[in-house]
Structures are given as C-alpha cells and as structure tokens.
C-alpha cells in the first residue's frame, strides 16, 4: 500500500498518510486505556502494548495485516519489531496520535 519497507524497522506509514485508509485497515492503538480515552483515531481498537505482547495470538490473526499506533511511534515501533519476529503482519504508524492532524480524530 502506501507504507514503505525498511529492513531495520519493517513496514512503516506516517500517521498523516492514513486518513484515506481509515475503515479499511485494522488499526490498533497500543497506548494505555487512560491515554486512549483522551483521544485516538476513528476505528482504532485499544489493546495496551503489555497485553498485546503478552498474548498476541489472543488479539491478532497471522493472516491479516494490522496497523499499530501509539502516542509518538516509539512504542509502536518496538511492538511491531516483536510482532514481526513472531510472524505477524504489522505496519508501524509513525508519528502516532500526537502528530496526527487529520480529520478522523475521535
């Protein structure tokens, strides 16, 4: 799609390039619940990073692609690295909610 691939970080897309993908992608906000409640991006499902990494098979299907989002892109990059290593198809949403200027905020 619009993501670019970098060997060291895997698939990455800038948060401000996802507006036209909202509703068509599996978007997961890995921030803590209190952070998520303060605002996220429409259709993002909240699964805190600790829970997701503890039991990824509980939340993710290896046959689907997931876009992983956090506040700045740092946590999502770490999570994507671990999830990719486990065989999941993930895209890091760089910049995170903190950099998002699109119209799909909730």
Spans of model-derived segments:
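Rhodanese-like catalytic fold shared by cysteine-dependent sulfurtransferases
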Residues: 1-16, 21-25, 33-65, 74-106
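Short, surface-exposed ligand- or partner-binding patches at beta-edge/loop junctions that are enriched
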Residues: 69
């Amino acid at each position: 799609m619009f993501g670019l691939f970098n060997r060291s970080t895997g698939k990455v897309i800038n948060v401000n390039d996802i507006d036209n993908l909202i509703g068509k992608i599996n978007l997961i906000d890995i921030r803590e619940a209190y952070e998520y409640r303060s605002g996220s991006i429409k259709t993002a499902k909240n699964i805190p990073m600790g829970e997701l990494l503890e039991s990824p098979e509980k939340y993710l299907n290896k046959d689907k692609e997931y876009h992983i989002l956090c506040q700045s892109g740092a946590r999502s990059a770490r999570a994507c690295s671990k999830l990719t290593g486990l065989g999941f198809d993930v895209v890091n949403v760089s910049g995170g909610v903190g950099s998002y200027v699109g119209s799909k905020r909730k």
